[in-house]
A protein has these predicted regions:
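Helical "lid/coupling" subdomains associated with nucleotide-phosphate turnover
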Residues: 1-183
């Protein structure tokens, strides 16, 4: 659920009180580096929006799973795909089929500038693009809320489970129930 568990503070020097919440200390050298509850929430909001958008596109295409994922730009070039999936930034997929496309926008722009036939083909594809306005999509909010959990509240991640141990669904439900009692 993204809550830094304060009950673990007695067991770990990395978890410290931070006002009404807790933080996870990465380094306590000359400058303390810590992950705060607000940091976790910001990641949750960003990844939930991305994942919800992906789910809307999957629904439009009437597909349940993806065979491959290409991540573009500097973000896609530097992120560890396993941890992107652990966070739930991307849907479950064979990790060998997730890769970086590099500077896809720059490459596409060069191709369009230097090759007339390619430019014509790109223009044809652009005319076929269908805009999906997430703000008016009925399922967006539901997908967004479900995607707030790490990696996801209801979607399974069988490919990810092959490389890391995921919490059991009962563990997730028990944690959610205990958080409801706190409020």
């Amino acid at each position: 659920d993204g809550v830094i568990n304060g009950a673990l503070a007695a067991k770990s020097k990395h978890i410290i009180a931070d006002g009404r919440t807790f933080s996870y200390v990465l380094s306590n050298g000359q400058h303390m580096i810590q992950v705060t509850q607000n940091d976790v929430r910001a990641i949750q909001l960003a990844k939930a929006a991305l994942y919800a958008g992906i789910r809307l596109l999957m629904e439009r295409m009437e597909i349940k799973t993806v065979d491959r994922i290409r991540l573009a730009g500097a973000f896609g070039s530097h992120i560890d795909v396993k941890y992107a999936m652990v966070l739930g930034l991307i849907p479950d997929c064979d990790l060998e089929q997730v890769s970086s496309a590099g500077n896809a926008a720059g490459t596409g722009a060069r191709i369009a500038l230097l090759n007339y036939e390619s430019r014509q083909e790109i223009e044809e594809v652009v005319r076929e693009v269908e805009k999906v306005e997430t703000a008016v999509e009925a399922n967006f909010q539901e997908h967004f809320v479900q995607a707030m959990a790490f990696p996801h509240k209801v979607d399974s991640f069988p490919n990810l489970a092959k490389v890391i141990e995921l919490p059991a669904e009962t563990d997730l439900q028990n944690n959610a129930d205990s958080n409801q009692h706190r409020k």
